[in-house]
């Protein structure tokens, strides 16, 4: 029984010394992050879609801090580009594309449920948890949460997911309520 206690004490001592060495090394060799990268990253929509050409919002924020174009974030659109321009004190640029400033047409993922095998690979790859389902069960996309990033397309083994444009209807139209005059009508109440 005493050899058991000796082994426990030896392993505990090794763990304690290793922890102290790692703690010292972490403080000694700590790399300070660039605060401008943190601020740019906070402005980005965090959809991790990769439409800017970078694997996520953080790498794109680092690239913008190093001089990359500020107009590549499609999900953020013009509002994010203008906020980044104000932060960096540079002129706003037209959104990436045909040189014309336009809002990209919103797309959402659509799953062909007849071909879905329920592998959950699309659920694991969705950065905003817009796909719901269970193993070996049908999956579906919550279109209000889907950013249209397309990260769910490559892992699908049956290619049953496609991006479809969202038609502009009264339900999907971006209403600017500040331009609509609102008048409050008095209503008589009968008791």
UniProtKB/Swiss-Prot annotation:
Part of a membrane-bound complex that couples electron transfer with translocation of ions across the membrane. Gene3D superfamilies: 3.30.70.20, Electron transport complex subunit B, putative Fe-S cluster (1.10.15.40). Keywords: 4Fe-4S, Cell inner membrane, Cell membrane, Electron transport, Iron, Iron-sulfur, Membrane, Metal-binding, Repeat, Translocase, Transport. Binds 3 [4Fe-4S] clusters. Its main location: membrane. The keyword DNA-binding does not apply. Residues 107-136, 137-166 form the 4Fe-4S ferredoxin-type domain. NCBIfam families: PRK05113.1, rnfB. Pfam families: Fer4_21 (PF14697), FeS (PF04060). [4Fe-4S] cluster 3 binds at residues 126, 146, 149, 152. [4Fe-4S] cluster 2 binds at residues 116, 119, 122, 156. GO terms for cellular component: plasma membrane. Residues 1-26 are annotated as: Hydrophobic. The keyword Methyltransferase does not apply. InterPro entries: 4Fe-4S_dom, 4Fe4S_Fe-S-bd, 4Fe4S_Fe_S_CS, 4Fe4S_Ferredoxin_RnfB, Elect_transpt_cplx_RnfB/RsxB, RnfB/RsxB_Proteobac. It is found in: Cell inner membrane. Belongs to the 4Fe4S bacterial-type ferredoxin family. RnfB subfamily. GO terms for molecular function: 4 iron, 4 sulfur cluster binding; electron transfer activity; metal ion binding. This is Ion-translocating oxidoreductase complex subunit B. [4Fe-4S] cluster 1 binds at residues 49, 52, 57, 73. SUPFAM superfamilies: 4Fe-4S ferredoxins. Its cofactor is [4Fe-4S] cluster. Signal peptide: none annotated.
